[in-house]
């Protein structure tokens, strides 16, 4: 599963997920991309589940790029523990997703196969997505 090797601080504030994604919003590496339309959090497990789905669908053909990385730690206090006494231990890692963020890219496969793979992967994600094609300039 994806997670940072080391961080400056162990725990993070919750924060608010507002605005649109301006960086990482275009197809930069492949021919087709899976782009977020909604906002939310994508856990390391969800990133891996969607990646495995895409890989299984395209089999040996094509190259896949993962354009997101879970760099935010989410903490959780154990069950039946009273409030207070500090923040709980880190349970898992997430990536904050804003509308317009490119999640996955693929090349070397037909458009039909790319659409099928991305549709299956999108079912594993907690927000709406769309499939985009690279625009030649």
From Swiss-Prot:
Source taxon at top rank: Bacteria
Coiled-coil annotated residue ranges, if any: none
InterPro entries, per the entry: Ribosomal_uL16, Ribosomal_uL16_bact-type, Ribosomal_uL16_CS, Ribosomal_uL16_dom, Ribosomal_uL16_sf
GO BP annotations, alphabetical order: translation
PROSITE patterns recorded: RIBOSOMAL_L16_1, RIBOSOMAL_L16_2
One GO cellular component term: cytosolic large ribosomal subunit
Xref: CDD domains: Ribosomal_L16_L10e
One Pfam match: Ribosomal_L16
Protein keywords: Ribonucleoprotein, Ribosomal protein, RNA-binding, rRNA-binding, tRNA-binding
A molecular function GO annotation: tRNA binding
HAMAP family in the record: Ribosomal_uL16
Classification via PANTHER family: 50S/60S RIBOSOMAL PROTEIN L16, LARGE RIBOSOMAL SUBUNIT PROTEIN UL16M
Subunit description: Part of the 50S ribosomal subunit.
Reported function: Binds 23S rRNA and is also seen to make contacts with the A and possibly P site tRNAs.
Family recorded in the similarity comment: Belongs to the universal ribosomal protein uL16 family.
Name used for this protein in its record: Large ribosomal subunit protein uL16
Organism: Psychrobacter sp. (strain PRwf-1)
Name of encoding gene: rplP
